[in-house]
UniProtKB/Swiss-Prot annotation:
NCBIfam families attached to this UniProt entry: rplB_bact
A Pfam family the protein falls into: Ribosomal_L2
PANTHER family to which the protein is assigned, alphabetical: LARGE RIBOSOMAL SUBUNIT PROTEIN UL2M, RIBOSOMAL PROTEIN L2
Disordered: annotated span: 38-59, 225-276
Assembly and binders: Part of the 50S ribosomal subunit. Forms a bridge to the 30S subunit in the 70S ribosome.
Biased composition (Basic residues): 50-59
Coiled coil location: none
Name by which UniProt lists this protein: Large ribosomal subunit protein uL2
Annotated SUPFAM superfamilies: Nucleic acid-binding proteins (SSF50249), Translation proteins SH3-like domain (SSF50104)
GO MF term set: rRNA binding; structural constituent of ribosome; transferase activity
Biological processes annotated in GO: cytoplasmic translation
Organism: Cupriavidus metallidurans (strain ATCC 43123 / DSM 2839 / NBRC 102507 / CH34)
Length: 276
């Protein structure tokens, strides 16, 4: 994997920086693990925009990734190849199990074709293997961590992501996330050893607005250039300041304001990610 700065043959390529991984498969993805993916464009079932700045973009097939990895315990597996996935920042690996079944998983850092993998409590503590947290040594770097047993990985799934197992106490373990938050999870929750691969993803430079549109991301208009009917920062004669602290279009403070409202799981957070 390497960062490649393109030659300035056009304004769009002048500042472009690409992440090149020669180990990625160059052919078609594994067809049985593909599903149709329909454009939502940030709309809900009523057609109302629930997520702004989404729409357009290239068509993608969804790659069915196994985030649970709990029904192949003790079965030897081998990484067949690494692949690009347009639906996420991390790369994925096509894994062949000894019983003949193939599945996609999130590729960990250092994973290569031909590497042996195993799931379950008997698996060795080696990057790419998936185990219950009760069988993972304290201090181990992990990724693809479950929050609820059997629900599938929800934490540390993006490129370069990881968490650290800090402690085990009774039925719960403490996991420190990249944000600094320390969270309690049940020891029957599963996690994968190591960090997520494609860690240089955050260093890429897209280079031009059109490439962002290919990814289905639409422009973000500043509130200060809108009319008062559209945004609290809008209005004024000529170019004017917002006249107040930064807020969202709905008046919620935009800088440092806590919006977490799920009190039911507050007891599972040992240390918040906020400094104050």
């Amino acid at each position: 994997m390497a960062l490649v700065k393109t030659k300035p043959t056009s304004p769009g390529r002048r500042s472009m920086v690409k992440v090149v991984n020669k180990d990625l498969h160059k052919g078609a993805p594994h067809a049985p693990l593909l599903e149709k993916q329909f454009q939502k464009s940030g709309r809900n079932n009523n057609g109302h925009i629930t997520t702004r700045h989404k729409g357009g973009g290239h068509k993608h097939h969804y790659r069915v990734v196994d985030f649970k990895r709990n029904d192949k315990d003790g079965i030897a597996a081998k990484v067949e190849r690494l692949e690009y996935d347009p639906n996420r920042s991390a790369n994925i690996a096509l894994v062949l199990f000894a019983d003949g079944e193939r599945r996609y998983i999130i590729a960990t850092k250092g994973m290569v074709a031909g590497q042996a993998l195993m799931n379950g409590s008997e698996a060795p503590i080696k990057a790419g293997n998936n185990l219950p947290i009760r069988n993972i040594p304290v201090g181990t770097t992990i990724n693809n961590v479950e929050i609820l047993p059997g629900k599938g990985a929800q934490v540390a799934r993006a490129a370069g992501g990881s968490a650290v197992l800090l402690a085990r106490e009774g039925l719960y373990a403490q996991v420190r996330l990249r944000s600094g938050e320390v969270r309690r999870v049940h020891i029957e929750c599963r996690a994968t050893i190591g960090e997520v691969g494609n860690e240089e993803h955050s260093l890429r430079v897209i280079g031009k607005a059109g490439a962002t549109r290919w990814r289905g991301i639409r422009p973000t208009v500043r509130g200060v250039v809108m009319n008062p009917v559209d945004h609290p920062h809008g209005g004024g004669e000529g170019k004017t300041a917002a006249g107040r602290d930064p807020v969202s279009p709905w008046g919620t403070p935009a800088k440092g304001y806590r919006t977490r409202s799920n009190k039911r799981t507050d007891s599972m957070i040992v240390q918040r990610r906020h400094k104050r």
